[in-house]
């Protein structure tokens, strides 16, 4: 199943001011939380790249994105997104290296954080390669992490900023009720 945010502008058409307004609201929260810090925002391909770019513009922050593309001659840091249709993700190592000398906080930008596992894999990879050079945070429109995942992030001092907290515990059960052979379904009941 795929939960679609009707205001995001990725899966179904939306008036640009609706999507951009939502992105501005998230940028405001990030800006207040990390006021005065120089930030590197990393938008996750493919769905969160526009969100990350919009936040970076509003915050005056550095920006890069993960990718699934392969450019010859570029060194990447590879990690996996186990639940995705295309599991391999990567970031350009040279861009992280360049940020390491002048940026302290990396903010990972997502449309929705469900388990936090993909971001956690990238955090572990960056800590392995860069030690304590960076602190990490996550900014998302939706946060569906369960209590155990949130506690893991808190224990590791990874900040969380989001617009809406969601409960995904019943999604598989609810989605199973709607077999529509790939056709658009109306929103599920609460």
Where are each of the predicted segments found?
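PRPP-associated nucleotide enzymes
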Residues: 1-190
């Amino acid at each position: 199943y795929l939960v679609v945010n009707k205001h995001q502008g990725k899966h179904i058409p939306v008036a640009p001011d609706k999507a951009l307004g939502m992105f501005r609201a998230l940028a405001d929260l990030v800006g207040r939380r990390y006021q005065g810090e120089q930030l590197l925002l990393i938008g996750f391909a493919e769905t969160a790249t526009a969100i990350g770019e919009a936040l970076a513009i509003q915050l005056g922050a550095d920006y890069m994105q993960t990718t699934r593309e392969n450019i010859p001659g570029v060194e990447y840091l590879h990690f996996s997104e186990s639940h995705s249709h295309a599991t391999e993700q990567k970031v350009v190592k040279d861009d992280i290296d360049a940020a390491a000398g002048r940026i302290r906080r990396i903010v990972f930008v997502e449309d929705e954080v469900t388990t936090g596992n993909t971001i956690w894999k990238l955090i572990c990879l960056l800590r392995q390669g860069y030690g304590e050079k960076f602190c990490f945070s996550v900014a998302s429109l939706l946060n569906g992490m369960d209590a155990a995942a949130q506690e893991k992030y808190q224990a590791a001092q990874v900040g969380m900023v989001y617009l809406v907290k969601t409960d995904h515990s019943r999604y598989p059960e609810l989605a199973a009720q709607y077999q529509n052979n790939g056709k658009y379904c109306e929103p599920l009941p609460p």
